[in-house]
A protein has these predicted regions:
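Conserved short loop/turn motifs at secondary-structure junctions
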Residues: 31-38, 73-81, 210-212
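Single conserved hydrophobic/aromatic residue that forms the stacking wall/gate
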Residues: 2-10
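Histidine-anchored nucleotide/phosphate-binding helix
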Residues: 10-24
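Glycine/small-residue-rich interface belts in oligomeric ring/scaffold proteins
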Residues: 37-54, 227, 255, 274
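Active-site cores that bind ATP or allylic diphosphates and position pyrophosphate for catalysis
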Residues: 91, 99-100, 104-238, 243-255, ...
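A generic secondary-structure signal for well-formed alpha-helical elements
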Residues: 51-58, 93-100, 112, 119, ...
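Catalytic adenosine-cofactor/nucleotide-binding cores of aminoacyl-tRNA synthetases and other
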Residues: 229-413, 417, 424
């Protein structure tokens, strides 16, 4: 399953790893929109459209605004599943595994200050959980008095005990049990992410959850919630983030949507990297054996590669723009002239006004011009890594022309004209560079 997140390169990277289609399963989108402060307007539209261009399509789940959801396990927006979560929460209360907490913000702040003074772990747990052992009479009195409350898990964890997360990428990870009496339902009856995640993954039949490694620390809580609710837990794979080198000391850091323009998928669209190039590159950093497979299967569709989670990097793949460009040159070199025409035409409409005008006015000339940079004689060239390279590398074809060239002062205007006329007459774009140079010398 896939939860609502941002539309960055890392998300395309993560969703490329989805094993649903290789296992005849279902890949679905669930919008986790219970936190209205963080909700993104038209979030479903952005997720679906931005990822669709990279071939990431959902089999079922939440749909774009105004469209009907697909699938039998909806609604797929958590804000529409409030009563479902409350039913599961009620069962936990009946079994003594959850309780109402009436602590005010001021009381919670006092607990925090006491923990700071005592240098204790922060949180609502153990002796610091003031409402944990309230009697039924006290609870009823508080509710009748109109006191607001949240519903908390009654944790049975012990910090001295260890649990094992059997991660599909990292292997077994030992961690202390959860001891926190976390909030399950907020005062408005809306669930927290952690509780909704457990209920929905069970009801929607989730078998595998693939998520970022920042969620590893939440595993003990999720394990406890699944166990308390007597629900089968899915398998987890925690993916390390894409990294980049930062500064002169070559320090690695996480690729950031705030700092790095290349972290956004729109960066690649605007630059003109073909979708297939980006996906091909991401696979080279996602699975250590992909490049070897590609060498043996140069013309095979990427979907034929058997992706393995255990082959993913544990420490985080290093993003390399030069490597992306190299991969993209290979991808573009294999495109037919017709495919090149179609892809460049679509890209130019939104990203290169002059090139678009040229293609629109002279489509046949543009088709012919493709041959000039695609071939060197009979050999296929690998000069172009992205569509924006065209105007930069071939301004005499698609840009403003070549400015500022100065002939030798010894040449008269007539001699210059005679040279250009002879060169044009002798030029043959079908010959290779060696034959071309011999022709220039002859002129």
């Amino acid at each position: 399953r896939d939860a609502q997140e941002s539309r960055g390169l890392g998300d395309v990277y993560k969703r490329q790893m989805c094993m649903a289609r290789q296992s005849d399963g279902v890949f679905y989108l669930r919008l986790e929109d219970t936190d209205k402060k963080r909700e993104i307007e038209h979030g479903a539209d952005e997720i679906i459209t931005s990822l669709a261009q990279y071939g990431v399509c959902f089999d079922e789940g939440a749909a774009a605004d105004g469209e009907a959801e697909k699938g039998s396990y909806g609604p797929y927006r958590q804000s529409m599943r409030k009563e479902i979560y409350q039913t599961f929460a009620k069962d936990l209360v009946k079994r003594g595994l959850a309780y109402p907490c009436f602590c005010s913000a001021e009381e919670l702040d006092e607990i925090r200050k006491a923990q700071e003074a005592e240098k204790a772990d922060m949180g609502y747990y153990g002796s610091y959980a003031k409402c944990r052992n309230l009697s039924i009479e006290e609870i009823e009195a508080n509710i009748k008095a109109g006191k607001e409350y949240v519903l908390r898990l009654r944790s049975d964890g012990n910090a001295e005990n260890k649990i094992t997360c059997r991660d599909l990428i990292r292997g077994n990870i030992e961690m202390p049990e959860n001891i926190m009496d976390v909030v399950l339902l907020k005062s408005d009856g809306i669930p927290t992410y952690h509780f909704a995640h457990v209920v929905d993954d069970f009801l929607m039949g989730t078998t595998h959850v693939i998520r970022g490694d920042e969620w590893i620390s939440s595993y003990p809580l999720h394990e406890q919630l699944f166990r308390a609710s007597d629900l089968k837990m899915p398998k987890y794979a925690h993916i390390a983030p894409i990294m980049k080198l930062d500064g002169g000391e070559n320090k690695k850091r996480k690729l950031s949507k705030r700092k790095d323009p290349e972290a956004s998928v729109s960066f690649y669209s605007k630059a003109g990297f073909p979708v297939q190039s980006v996906l091909e590159y991401l696979m080279t950093i996602a699975n250590s054996n992909y490049e070897e497979w590609r060498m043996k299967n140069p013309d095979a569709d990427m979907s034929q590669f058997k992706f393995k989670l255990e082959k993913m990097p544990v420490s985080g793949a290093l993003f390399d723009m030069d490597k992306l460009a190299s991969v993209s040159r290979d991808v573009i070199s294999k495109m037919s002239e017709e495919t090149l025409f179609d892809e460049i035409s679509v890209w130019a409409k939104d990203n290169d006004e002059k090139l678009n005008a040229y293609i629109t006015a002279s489509p046949d000339k543009f088709r012919e011009s493709i041959k000039l940079w695609k071939y060197n004689g009979k050999k296929v060239r690998k000069d172009i890594a992205k569509w924006s390279d065209l105007s930069e590398m071939f301004p005499y074809l698609y840009g403003d022309g070549v400015d500022g060239y100065e002939f030798d002062e010894k040449l008269t205007a007539d001699e210059r004209k005679a040279f250009l006329t002879a060169y044009i007459s002798a030029y043959d774009h079908k010959v290779d560079s060696s034959a071309w140079f011999d022709g220039v010398k002859a002129v």
